């Protein structure tokens, strides 16, 4: 499953902070070094501040063990192929595990039977990414969240760009999607 986290900390609030933490799209701990110093997204009537910045704060995905499972699988499988099937609920930083996988299947809520049809060669995939996969968390912080398709996207070890509309089938990369 794509990384998931809690973007709010009552402990941070109790210690004088504003309670807000960065939303991480990676499994390992992420410290927001490029976040805005001032974020005027405040406005909740229960808050006595208007700056929701999380600059310098750290957050970790609560499913960080998913990455450990991939890395352990790679060690256990040795030279045998490793296929990572990621249930994608939001964009994710792929560089943490892409080099350890021989194939990555990104599924967005389809049945397990449909995924297995692709894995076992019973169905030639035709899907494309409906989102951009960020190069890293810096790319996430630098994008304009209200502007589509402006993120620096991940390019894997074989040169595939995980941009909106990217997809592969058994023959190779699907024809380019026209923006």
Task: Go through each PLM region and give its residues.
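C-terminal non-catalytic regions of proteins with extracellular/luminal or membrane-system context
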Residues: 1-179
């Amino acid at each position: 499953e794509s990384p998931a986290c809690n973007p709010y900390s009552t402990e941070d609030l109790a210690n004088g902070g504003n309670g807000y933490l960065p939303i991480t799209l990676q499994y390992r701990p992420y410290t927001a070094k490029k976040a805005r110093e001032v974020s005027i997204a405040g406005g909740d009537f229960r808050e006595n501040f208007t700056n929701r910045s999380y600059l310098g704060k750290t957050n970790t995905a609560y499913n960080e063990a998913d990455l450990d499972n991939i890395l352990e699988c790679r060690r256990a499988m040795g030279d045998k192929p490793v296929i990572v099937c990621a249930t994608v609920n939001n964009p994710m930083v792929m560089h943490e595990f892409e080099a350890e996988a021989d194939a990555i299947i990104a599924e967005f809520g389809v049945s397990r039977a449909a995924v297995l049809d692709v894995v076992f060669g019973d169905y030639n995939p035709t899907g494309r990414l409906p989102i951009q996969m960020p190069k890293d968390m810096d790319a996430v912080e630098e994008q304009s969240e209200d502007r589509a398709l402006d993120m620096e996207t991940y390019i894997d070890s074989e040169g595939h760009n995980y941009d909106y509309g990217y997809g592969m089938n058994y023959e190779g990369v699907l024809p380019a999607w026209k923006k």
